[in-house]
């Protein structure tokens, strides 16, 4: 396969999207909500876990693919991809955790830091590759 790191991360994201989509549908059926969330905490958690992954996965996969195509170090790319995936799983778990008023659950915090760190690393790395390799 030409882009194995990108393919691996994309495949895991696809599975996570499917899992979160199925749970969102289950929650919608439970509260009989075709549209909106009806203020139901479980439906909100399910739909946001799916939506949040759908928001961050595409740019991460694109950046991984660009870097892999530019022959960036595969081991480093796999580590960054793994951090992203671990962060996404943590974020999903955090959205389902019991909420203390005014404080995000620790898994959600880990997920946010991992996701933002991944985007910063991949974005910076891509710009660095553009500035140094393609001159």
Regions found by a protein language model. Give the residues of each.
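N-terminal signal-anchor transmembrane alpha helix
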Residues: 3-33
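Membrane-embedded alpha-helical transmembrane segments of multi-pass integral membrane proteins
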Residues: 13-16, 20, 64, 83, ...
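Cytosolic, membrane-interface loops and tails of multi-pass inner-membrane proteins
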Residues: 22-47, 98
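Juxtamembrane helix-capping/reentrant segments at transmembrane boundaries
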Residues: 37-51, 103-112
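Core segments of transmembrane alpha-helices
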Residues: 52-64, 119-120
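Short alpha-helical packing/oligomerization segments
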Residues: 65-87
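Interfacial loop-to-transmembrane junctions
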Residues: 92-118
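Juxtamembrane boundary at the C-terminal end of a transmembrane helix
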Residues: 123-135
